[in-house]
């Protein structure tokens, strides 16, 4: 519980919205070796586009073992074989923080979006592989799944943005996961930017907001189609 309390205390709200107007919750998750402050510019950009959103940047719970910043799990000695164990060990706390902010704001999973960069994106993506989804949308910036994923719970939309020049997490992980998920019928967008490294720049911010604003989730289409069919005169 102390770790959860610390996460809640160290989170940065950007900005503090009018409580009567709040209709969405964005939760931002930074990469390894940096902190919640590093995602403030992302939150400020989102606040301009979504003025009725509650936007909070979460500080990872552990001091980074590489000398500065914070982390969800250590990347020292991380391999394809042990990455999943490290993510799984931190997932209960990650989910608890999301649920705590949902209770605090009165906003449910259907109006929650997770935006993660690097390790924060890994945790955000992997949250969709749990038994119950905690967010309707997940934005992965320079992230990856631990392994080939299954389709998230119905209603969850993924937006994956990656740089072809990323030296930290190869863009191939994004492409492979996206191709697999499309084949399985998942709702997602995936963009690989040819000149992008392991970073969040203005091009990424503009593309992210474009996807969030303009992509109509498949679940919305399904409901609209069902309503149209039910109202069609018989005979």
What feature does the model see in each segment?
Residues 3-107:
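Serine-hydrolase catalytic machinery in alpha/beta-hydrolase-like enzymes
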Residues 23, 110, 153-158, 184:
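Short, proline-enriched alpha-helix->beta-strand connector loops that line the catalytic pocket
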Residues 30-32, 112-117, 163:
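Conserved alpha/beta-hydrolase "nucleophile elbow" surrounding the catalytic nucleophile
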Residues 59-63, 144, 196:
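Short beta-to-alpha linker loops that shape the active-site pocket of alpha/beta-hydrolase fold enzymes
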Residues 110-155:
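Primarily recognizes the serine-hydrolase "nucleophile elbow" in alpha/beta-hydrolase
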Residues 160-162, 166:
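Short beta-strand/loop motif that positions the catalytic acidic residue
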Residues 172-235:
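C-terminal catalytic histidine-bearing segment of alpha/beta-hydrolase fold enzymes
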């Amino acid at each position: 519980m102390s770790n959860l309390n610390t996460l809640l205390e160290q989170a940065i709200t950007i900005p503090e919205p009018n409580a009567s107007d709040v209709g969405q919750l964005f939760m931002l998750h930074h990469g390894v070796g940096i902190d919640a402050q590093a995602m403030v510019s992302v939150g400020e950009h989102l606040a301009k586009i979504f003025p009725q959103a509650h936007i909070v940047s979460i500080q990872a719970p552990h001091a980074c073992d590489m000398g500065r910043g914070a982390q969800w799990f250590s990347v020292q000695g991380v391999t394809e074989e042990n990455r999943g164990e490290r993510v799984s060990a931190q997932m209960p706390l990650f989910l608890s923080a999301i649920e705590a902010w949902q209770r605090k704001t009165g906003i449910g999973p259907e109006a929650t979006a997770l935006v993660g960069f690097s390790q924060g994106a890994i945790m955000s993506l992997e949250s969709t592989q749990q038994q119950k989804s905690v967010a309707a949308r997940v934005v992965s910036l320079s992230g990856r799944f631990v392994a080939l994923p299954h389709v998230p719970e119905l209603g969850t939309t993924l937006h994956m943005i990656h740089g072809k020049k990323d030296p930290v997490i190869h863009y191939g992980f994004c492409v492979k996961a996206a191709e697999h998920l499309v084949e399985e019928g998942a709702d997602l967008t995936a963009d690989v930017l040819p000149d992008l490294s392991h970073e969040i720049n203005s091009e990424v911010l503009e593309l992210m907001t474009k996807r969030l604003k303009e992509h109509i989730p498949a679940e919305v289409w399904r409901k609209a189609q069902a309503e149209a069919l039910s109202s069609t005169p018989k005979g």
